[in-house]
């Protein structure tokens, strides 16, 4: 396994862990002028780009993809899109942890699939198995599993108090 590619694949997870466990510090760091969810989204997009570049660095692309690619990628991305559509940026990027009032959502996929955005992301990664070595897909997926576990143990008392 290429060490740099492995580091790139894992890069966002320490950031997500730190935000989840130190929400008030992040809110304070962002200050009154910057929305903590928006700043998190921007940083996350940069980290996601690094993850994707890491995968491309070890990938062997070929066309056409295997048949399993299409349903896994399509449904995985549908779940990601749907979660973002229902929760918005603040709901997707830890808004509740940062002291925002995010309404509870019960529409599909919530209430049917536990952690639908993580499930969708893992499905999308699995779709790429014909191009990317298994160990990188596994490593990235384990990062999501770690975050699902961490977020399932949420302590509401650890939520940040909004400074706005």
UniProtKB/Swiss-Prot annotation:
Highest taxon of source: Eukaryota
Pathway: Phospholipid metabolism; phosphatidylcholine biosynthesis
Residue ranges annotated as Cytoplasmic topological domain: 53-69, 152-164
Catalysed reactions listed for this entry: a 1,2-diacyl-sn-glycero-3-phospho-N-methylethanolamine + S-adenosyl-L-methionine = a 1,2-diacyl-sn-glycero-3-phospho-N,N-dimethylethanolamine + S-adenosyl-L-homocysteine + H(+); a 1,2-diacyl-sn-glycero-3-phospho-N,N-dimethylethanolamine + S-adenosyl-L-methionine = a 1,2-diacyl-sn-glycero-3-phosphocholine + S-adenosyl-L-homocysteine + H(+)
One Gene Ontology term from the biological process aspect of the record: methylation
UniProt keyword terms in alphabetical order: Endoplasmic reticulum, Lipid biosynthesis, Lipid metabolism, Membrane, Methyltransferase, Phospholipid biosynthesis, Phospholipid metabolism, S-adenosyl-L-methionine, Transferase, Transmembrane, Transmembrane helix
Membrane topology: Multi-pass membrane protein
GO molecular function: phosphatidyl-N-methylethanolamine N-methyltransferase activity; phosphatidylethanolamine N-methyltransferase activity
A UniProt-annotated Pfam family: PEMT
InterPro entries: PEMT/MFAP (IPR024960), Phopholipid_MeTrfase (IPR007318)
Main location, first listed in the record: endoplasmic reticulum
Lumenal side: 22-30, 91-131
UniProt: S-adenosyl-L-methionine binding residues: 74-76, 154-155
Top-level enzyme category: transferase
Effects seen without this gene: No visible phenotype under normal growth conditions.
Residue intervals passing through the bilayer: 31-52, 70-90, 132-151
Subcellular location: Endoplasmic reticulum membrane
Regions that enter the bilayer but do not cross it: 1-21
GO cellular component entries: endoplasmic reticulum membrane; intracellular membrane-bounded organelle
E.C. number(s) listed in UniProt: 2.1.1.71
Function, in words: Catalyzes the second two steps of the methylation pathway of phosphatidylcholine biosynthesis, the SAM-dependent methylation of phosphatidylmonomethylethanolamine (PMME) to phosphatidyldimethylethanolamine (PDME) and of PDME to phosphatidylcholine (PC).
Protein family membership: Belongs to the class VI-like SAM-binding methyltransferase superfamily. PEMT/PEM2 methyltransferase family.
Name of the featured protein: Phosphatidyl-N-methylethanolamine N-methyltransferase
């Amino acid at each position: 396994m290429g060490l740099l590619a492995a580091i790139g694949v894992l890069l966002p997870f320490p950031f997500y862990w730190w935000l989840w466990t130190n929400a008030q510090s992040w809110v304070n760091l962002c200050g009154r002028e910057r929305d903590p969810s928006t700043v998190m989204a921007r940083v996350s997009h940069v980290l996601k780009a690094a993850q994707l570049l890491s995968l491309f660095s070890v990938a062997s692309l070929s066309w056409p993809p295997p048949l399993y690619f299409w349903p896994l990628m399509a449904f995985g991305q549908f779940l990601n899109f749907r979660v973002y559509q229902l929760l918005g940026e603040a709901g997707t990027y830890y808004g509740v942890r940062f002291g925002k009032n995010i309404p509870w959502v019960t529409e599909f996929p919530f209430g049917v699939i536990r952690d639908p955005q993580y499930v969708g992301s893992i499905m999308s990664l699995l779709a790429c198995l014909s191009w990317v070595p298994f160990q990188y897909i596994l490593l990235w997926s384990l990062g999501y599993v770690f975050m699902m576990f961490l977020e399932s143990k949420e302590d509401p008392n650890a939520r940040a108090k909004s400074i706005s």
